[in-house]
Amino acid sequence: MVKETQYYDILGVKPSASPEEIKKAYRKLALKYHPDKNPDEGEKFKLISQAYEVLSDPKKRDVYDQGGEQAIKEGGSGSPSFSSPMDIFDMFFGGGGRMARERRGKNVVHQLSVTLEDLYNGVTKKLALQKNVICEKCEGVGGKKGSVEKCPLCKGRGMQIHIQQIGPGMVQQIQTVCIECKGQGERINPKDRCESCSGAKVIREKKIIEVHVEKGMKDGQKILFHGEGDQEPELEPGDVIIVLDQKDHSVFQRRGHDLIMKMKIQLSEALCGFKKTIKTLDNRILVITSKAGEVIKHGDLRCVRDEGMPIYKAPLEKGILIIQFLVIFPEKHWLSLEKLPQLEALLPPRQKVRITDDMDQVELKEFCPNEQNWRQHREAYEEDEDGPQAGVQCQTA
């Protein structure tokens, strides 16, 4: 039982979520709320990053589960020390962190929705991207030659320092992006700015790229287009990073190289055998057979070798197809009372039980728990002198 669930709620996962589920949740939310796409969601992006930083670290997650956010704060001498949200994003998507960003232009990260069929068969998709490119008219200068000057407000630092009093004898130093030069450290007189880029040095350009999704690739796998990201003056262009996002499939679930599916069979089929067909992800039809005399129990697993997912970079090799059988039992009174002895004669004999006078005979009814956990209501009943509240119910008919 965790103390609080705020970080889990931010990522939209349960406290029992696996590390892979936490990574997948962060990936989707970080791409959705990244400042480049949602400039007004900076605080949301920050909270998502903080939640992921804690829950992706087994030690921090354990501390959080036991003591909540307060325990995280106490573990950091009174205030939690979180990494930069952009550093977390870049490390997750392969950007390399702040130092790499200072030497290179921004990476452009895009999520590409794919089906399980796409990952099984391979597919090529075209993706239209918007990216920054150096302005050809001013060659990345931003204006006329010689018109660029050091920003007088921040003295070329790109940042402003503000001193704020937060209490008697206590002040706080706050660093913000310079409002005059927008963090560039330099400015251009409006009349001298380039007409094409308005002094921004770069312009937005649409580009179509072809993304080759190879057989066996996985959900969350990254495809890198080196040097195709945003361009900035005097910096090496960033990369375009495509992140595959697999849609849920109606029949199959993927587990590594294997495929898992559930198949319903009638009780007669479970006892007497059957032939069934399965449509594969490349539209072939498989015929599976359970021979007469073989008994399949509810929940039993069977497998078909070499019918799982192709293995990435070795597509001629495949995992296995795992089938879980769900046996459907007949409805009540499906057979007349007169015919039940005939059925019983065909089935294994019932276990005989010796009943004595000191035994209590009780009535067996269907268990129908309501939406709330029946154990909690039982505990409440034990503590409540007035008797049970609304809890476990049994059908009366």
UniProtKB/Swiss-Prot annotation:
Modified residues (Phosphoserine): 18
Topological type in the membrane: Lipid-anchor
Lipidation (S-farnesyl cysteine): 394
Name of the coding gene: DNAJA4
Span of zinc fingers (CR-type): 122-206
Annotated HAMAP family: DnaJ
Gene3D superfamilies the UniProt entry points to: DnaJ domain, Heat shock protein DnaJ, cysteine-rich domain, Urease metallochaperone UreE, N-terminal domain
Pfam family, one: DnaJ
Main location per the UniProt record: membrane
Residue ranges listed under propeptide: 395-397
Protein name: DnaJ homolog subfamily A member 4
Alphabetic keyword roster: Chaperone, Lipoprotein, Membrane, Metal-binding, Methylation, Phosphoprotein, Prenylation, Repeat, Zinc, Zinc-finger
